[in-house]
Amino acid sequence: ALFAAAGLAAAAPFETRQDYASCPVSTQGDYVWKISEFSGRKPEGTYYNSLSFNIKATNEGTLDFTCSAQADKLEDDKFYPCGENSSMSFAFQSDRNGLLFRQDVSNDITYVATATLPNYCRAGGDGPKDVICQGAS
């Protein structure tokens, strides 16, 4: 899950949330999003040329869509829009499977969130180094 905070100009990595029944989760002022269906392709086994994931609100919100980007070589730490005319964008950090997600709500409000997306890669079939990566629970 991703956690977002309003009004941040820069983001620092958040620690992984622990799923303990005794740990209360505050929802007032926080937005909690679930990331699923992560997939990506590394044509040379070292860099991504496509990334895709689903993002969904978990606090009775309406957010539920697929975010994706494709290029000859997707650059780490560069923000890519989730779609045409979208207020949402993401950046990826390959070395730690880190997702940085940003939603520009207004001139004064930006939600920023981070998550680590565990995944596994297998042979892709488009060459000896081509791999396809998918999210792992």
Curated annotation (Swiss-Prot):
Disulfide bonds join C67-C82, C121-C133. Residues 1-18 form the signal peptide. The keyword Secreted applies. Its main location: secreted. It is found in: Secreted. Belongs to the ALTA1 family. Keywords: Allergen, Disulfide bond, Secreted, Signal. GO terms for cellular component: extracellular region. This is Allergen Ste b 1. It holds the Pfam family AltA1. Homodimer; disulfide-linked. InterPro entries: AltA1.
